């Protein structure tokens, strides 16, 4: 049963692009995306604070669910909709501070053991990946594939879930067929020949999520 310690999110967050710049945040919110994550890696807080502030402001302007990857202190300081953390971040993050600030929390997982760890934190949603091979990020684990994804979805029942990793426009329908609540994409949009058309087609398949 879905009983997070953090504020809840809709079961369906819809199409969930993960991007590395404020420019992409603005572009995608302008064309109708309503769940999005700013993921900037390996920079100091002071180097990314201006981008975090700008992204959060855009999220508010478009009434969107804007998640900040990793930089949880900045997310709290500037009142983001939510924070997304990897497994490696859970032990070094003050989860109670995120909870007390009223921010939603998403947690990455790659196997059953990591799902156990995520469930212990009782986040707002659980991300499951990587589903397919991906070039976006170096991954120590093997791709899960659709059958394993479906197994995780069955286990998690009504817990909001997000599939991520190598999901293309062509693969999105099969991913949704597993029962996953949401689909995260990276290169399917940012490396598309026509990002507007790719986003429109993905929105038509996945949707913008529930209110």
UniProtKB/Swiss-Prot annotation:
Binding positions for 2-[(2R,5Z)-2-carboxy-4-methylthiazol-5(2H)-ylidene]ethyl phosphate? 134-136, 166, 186-187
Residues engaged in binding 4-amino-2-methyl-5-(diphosphooxymethyl)pyrimidine = 37-41, 69, 108, 137
Recorded metabolic or biological pathway in which this protein acts: Cofactor biosynthesis; thiamine diphosphate biosynthesis; thiamine phosphate from 4-amino-2-methyl-5-diphosphomethylpyrimidine and 4-methyl-5-(2-phosphoethyl)-thiazole: step 1/1
Q: Name one GO cellular component term.
A: cytoplasm
EC number of the protein: 2.5.1.3
Which example biological process does GO assign this protein?
thiamine diphosphate biosynthetic process
The answer, when asked if Metal-binding is one of the entry's keywords, is yes
What keywords does the record list, in alphabetical order?
Magnesium, Metal-binding, Thiamine biosynthesis, Transferase
Which residues does the annotation say bind Mg(2+)?
70, 89
Q: Which domain of life is it from?
A: Bacteria
Q: How is the cofactor bound?
A: Binds 1 Mg(2+) ion per subunit.
Q: Name one GO molecular function term.
A: magnesium ion binding
UniProt xrefs under Pfam families: TMP-TENI
Task: Kindly state which reaction or reactions the protein catalyses.
Answer: 2-[(2R,5Z)-2-carboxy-4-methylthiazol-5(2H)-ylidene]ethyl phosphate + 4-amino-2-methyl-5-(diphosphooxymethyl)pyrimidine + 2 H(+) = thiamine phosphate + CO2 + diphosphate; 2-(2-carboxy-4-methylthiazol-5-yl)ethyl phosphate + 4-amino-2-methyl-5-(diphosphooxymethyl)pyrimidine + 2 H(+) = thiamine phosphate + CO2 + diphosphate; 4-methyl-5-(2-phosphooxyethyl)-thiazole + 4-amino-2-methyl-5-(diphosphooxymethyl)pyrimidine + H(+) = thiamine phosphate + diphosphate
| Cofactor(s) essential for the protein | Mg(2+)
Record's keyword annotation contains Cell membrane: no
Role noted for this protein: Condenses 4-methyl-5-(beta-hydroxyethyl)thiazole monophosphate (THZ-P) and 2-methyl-4-amino-5-hydroxymethyl pyrimidine pyrophosphate (HMP-PP) to form thiamine monophosphate (TMP).
Q: Into which family does the record put it?
A: Belongs to the thiamine-phosphate synthase family.
Matches recorded under HAMAP family: TMP_synthase
Listed NCBIfam families = PRK03512.1, thiE
- Spell out the protein name for this chain: Thiamine-phosphate synthase
